[in-house]
Amino acid sequence: MPSVWHCRATGMARLCQPCGKYVRPLFLYMKHPFLLVWLTLIVLCGCTSSGKQKRHVIGLSQCMLDDAWREAMINDMRIEASNYDDVEIIIKDAQNNNETQIQQIRDLIRQKVDVLIISPYQSEPITAVAEEAYRAGIPTIITDRKVNTDQYTSFVGANNYEIGLAAGNYAAHYLPPNAIILEIWGLTQTSPAQERHKGFVDALREREDLSFRKIEGQWLVDTARMELRKLEHPEQIDFVYAHNDMMAIAAREYFIAWDSIRGRDLRIIGVDAVAGAGLEAVEDGRINASFLSPTG
């Protein structure tokens, strides 16, 4: 599933006057959009107006790092940045706390980073500080989860509605009449969770016989496990759709513990398809399918 790429920077290749090099248009860089967005935004062709090499500092505000998908994102970014001697990445981990993330973003603003990348914990609380960065003249990239403003430079993220739609179309092939679906949500206040839900239910809209149950796992495996233990009548569940693979794996563990035979037969799907987590879980049968959410 391709990334969605929105950017207000338009036009064909730009010429950097000091060194005479062209910066190619963004659509040529879809394989690794994160770093190449930064390179374009700060005209990273290895020079300043004096023609001397300048060190570029990228500030990254992550809402959390304790997650296989985000670990993969960070790893991809570090690998790509290692190709450039003049790029440094400063990574901040908000540990799923809005106030911590706000303070960390303001710290990056004070450091006058060349580019600021924000992956918000929740949209509304982070909106104002994202606007602060943008108004301070720092190119500000929002990734994964959206903010409630247009005061940012660009947004990079997966098409979460299409991910949900694909998951729903997959589910439609396996749902018996009058099936009961358990949906394990990410954080309900975040755009990926809302869009993955909407795509999923839209794909199944014609199936008026279906029923849905919902628990909020908040993207976290431990929270998903805790909420699963509160589930009433697990024997009624015919299908499980989790908003990420780690919560899907937690669901498999729960249902096997409840009934080893039925728990293994129950069809469970997730999202992310990250190497070392979801992909291996599909291969070894812990989950039945995983839908790709690109890390950028």
Regions found by a protein language model. Name each.
Residues T48-S50:
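Bacterial signal peptide processing site
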Residues V115-Y134, F200, R213, G217-E280:
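Hydrophobic alpha-helical
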Residues Q62, D66, M77, L165-E208, ...:
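An alpha-beta-alpha
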